[in-house]
Regions:
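Eukaryotic nuclear low-complexity, Arg/Ser/Gly/Pro-rich intrinsically disordered regions
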Residues: 1-49
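Intrinsic-disorder/low-complexity coil detector
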Residues: 22-23, 27, 34, 98, ...
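Generic preference for flexible, low-structure residues
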Residues: 25-28, 47, 72-74, 108-111, ...
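Interaction modules related to DNA damage response and DNA replication/repair
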Residues: 44-124
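Ser/Thr/Gly-rich flexible loops in soluble cytosolic domains mediating phosphotransfer, phosphorylation
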Residues: 116-143
C-alpha cells in the first residue's frame, strides 16, 4: 500500500507543478485566470485515469427498482473514469456480476468478448489506483 501511495503522490506532485508552470489565461476582459493547481483537482484527474476507456454494465449488483446511477459501485466506477451503462452494448468492456446463474447481460458480454468480473475487481482497482487484472476477479457464474 505504501508503494501505491507513493506512486499516487508522485503523480499528484507532478500534476500540481505542471499546472503551476502554465501561464495564466486571459479573459476577454483582460483578467488573468490562473490554472487549477489544486491538489484535489489533480487527484480527481489521476483517479479518473484508473478505468478510463472502460465501459461497464452491472448484473445482479444493483437491486431491482433501485436507480443504478446511485449505487455505490456505479458511482465508484464513474469516479475511476469508467462509463457505466444499464445494458450490454457493442462498446461494453466489462460486466460486473454478482455470483449466481448467468444473466442475459453475462451471456451477451461473453459472446462479445467482454470481461465478466466480480465487484471485487472495481474495489481492487480503486485501492491500487490502477486497473486490476481481470483474470484474478472472474465472476462466480454457475453453469
Amino acid at each position: 500500500m505504501l508503494a501505491v501511495a507513493l506512486r499516487v503522490l508522485l503523480a499528484v506532485h507532478g500534476g500540481v507543478f505542471a499546472a503551476l508552470a502554465v501561464p495564466p489565461r486571459r479573459l476577454p476582459s483582460g483578467d488573468a485566470v490562473a490554472p487549477n493547481w489544486d491538489a484535489r483537482a489533480v487527484l480527481g484527474t489521476e483517479r479518473a485515469r484508473v478505468l478510463a476507456g472502460c465501459r461497464i454494465a452491472f448484473s445482479r449488483v444493483v437491486p431491482l427498482g433501485a436507480p443504478p446511477a446511485e449505487h455505490p459501485l456505479w458511482r465508484l466506477a464513474e469516479r475511476l473514469g469508467a462509463a457505466c451503462a444499464t445494458a450490454v452494448g457493442a462498446g461494453t468492456t466489462h460486466v460486473v456480476a454478482a455470483p449466481g446463474p448467468p444473466t442475459d447481460k453475462v451471456l451477451a458480454a461473453r459472446a462479445a468478448g467482454a470481461a465478466v468480473v466480480s465487484p471485487g475487481w472495481l474495489q481492487c482497482s480503486a485501492t491500487l489506483w490502477r486497473r486490476a487484472d481481470e483474470a484474478h476477479f472472474s465472476a462466480q457464474i454457475e453453469g
